[in-house]
């Protein structure tokens, strides 16, 4: 009996806070509904306007005075050493974090003005900690989409990443399970194959913007090169950001953004930067030497 009385008192005491919380949630919903609907646009132009960003409880800015325009259909490599601000730039572009100062614009409008769900429909993203699930191959690619043209879209996506021949050779094709949790005859994919499957999942969405954030970080140089050779196919007709600390990918891109300590150190093509930017050329040569040494050890 005492417990019931105590519970009743607690409910009365905390009821006002519950009511305030419900009002807050409702207020957030109304605010979200008041935001702009993002109409389908043929060209998406992103602008970083004097953007600064500092993570909570940190003294240094992760991004400092970033001014950058990303035009529709551009293939960009964003490079720099660990901690240079590459992933922070992506999170700002996705609207997952808000600038401490400055604005990120889409076609001249602050992205915070758009409904977040509408805004994110423009992006397909592959992060370095991607997940492959022990479901069927097709379910890993289409995220359980059962639309009538799903199978054709799956085959197109896996062909673009160079997995079509491998998957077609399996007895059950795209209906093959990955791993043995649900099917003893499930297939095991190598690191490179799993990486390609994650990229195929992003391509299946067929969005206007594809972001690949360190997608080859865990792969050896040979497997990495195989993925790079598919870059033109992957990025065809799309705005593509390739975030990496490995500079071998940059020659496949229209432009290279070099970040250093959260700021743009240089901007240009791979060949321009090799000739004209000491920091970039030194990074490139150090990595080239590292890869050459690795190849010699394998031999």
Model features per residue range: what roles?
Residues 210-214:
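Catalytic Walker B motif of ABC-type/P-loop ATPase nucleotide-binding domains
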Residues 105, 164-197, 206-208, 290-299:
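ABC-fold ATPase nucleotide-binding domain signature/coupling loops
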Residues 94:
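Helix-to-loop junction immediately C-terminal to a conserved catalytic motif
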Residues 173, 229, 246, 251-299:
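C-terminal portion of ABC ATPase nucleotide-binding domains
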């Amino acid at each position: 009996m005492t417990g019931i009385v105590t519970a009743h008192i607690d409910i009365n005491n905390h009821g006002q806070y519950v009511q305030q919380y419900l009002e807050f949630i409702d207020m957030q919903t109304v605010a979200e509904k008041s935001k702009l609907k993002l109409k389908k646009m043929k060209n998406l132009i992103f602008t970083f306007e004097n953007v600064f960003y500092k993570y909570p409880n940190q003294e240094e800015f992760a991004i400092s005075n970033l001014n950058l325009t990303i035009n529709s259909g551009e293939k960009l490599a964003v490079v720099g050493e660990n901690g240079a601000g590459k992933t922070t730039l992506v999170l700002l572009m996705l609207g997952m974090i808000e600038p401490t100062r400055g604005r990120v614009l889409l076609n001249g409008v602050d992205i915070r003005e758009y409904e977040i769900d509408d805004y994110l429909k423009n992006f397909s993203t592959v992060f370095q900690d991607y997940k492959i699930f022990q479901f069927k191959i097709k379910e890993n690619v289409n995220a359980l989409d059962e639309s009538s043209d799903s199978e054709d879209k799956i085959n197109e996506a896996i062909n673009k990443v160079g997995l079509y021949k491998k998957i077609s050779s399996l007895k059950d094709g795209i209906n093959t399970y990955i791993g043995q949790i649900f099917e003893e005859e499930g297939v095991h994919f190598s690191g490179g194959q799993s990486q390609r499957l994650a990229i195929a999942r992003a391509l299946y969405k067929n969005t206007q913007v594809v972001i690949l954030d360190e997608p080859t970080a865990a792969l050896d140089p040979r497997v990495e090169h195989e993925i790079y050779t598919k870059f033109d196919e992957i990025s065809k007709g799309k705005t593509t950001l390739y975030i990496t600390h490995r500079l071998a990918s940059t020659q496949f891109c229209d432009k290279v953004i070099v970040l250093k300590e959260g700021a743009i150190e240089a901007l240009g093509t791979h060949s321009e930067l090799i000739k004209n930017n000491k920091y970039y050329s030194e990074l490139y040569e150090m990595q080239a030497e590292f890869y050459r040494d690795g190849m010699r050890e394998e031999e």
